[in-house]
């Protein structure tokens, strides 16, 4: 099987070294200082407040020719011993030509990576130097969107609204009881390939000025989250309506 080598990194809290707190604690050799700073900017230091979700899949472009596909999950207790839970973000970084083999669909690539044990805990977080991650040059997961079920059909209107907003260069948040992975997958398949190159989304991270995702998927939005979305001119779409 032909494979591709992609860069990988881990962002979490640590008390190792002169700087304590959240940072890239492990990375492969191709991640330089500039890329490290950008990956750190997009990676959260707070978890899934007031929500039952314990992990999130995220994707965002990095510079002109790179895309990061990340999975944020809960780790063990934080080193501070104050009772907090460690947030861990597992990161893969791909060139455009590598992602093109997956039709610029980060969901397909993430599912393939997870099937091979990547983007998952446990990792040896004491190892600062990681080898590049090896992935199939072509996806292992077939397109599951060709057969649309009743749930998918019921989301057709909201998917159409999101696609229209994306085409206008606007941002959106889907709030309500949807399957975020499946809905994001259907949305990506509905977008032209050229629109997928710079598309970004998160299936669970709360909005932040440092993480301007094009589309958020949120199970619900508290008053504080709603204010943040409004301040960033993010259009909220109610999936329960």
Model-derived segments and spans:
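Conserved, folded interaction/cargo-binding domains in eukaryotic regulatory proteins
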Residues: 153-238
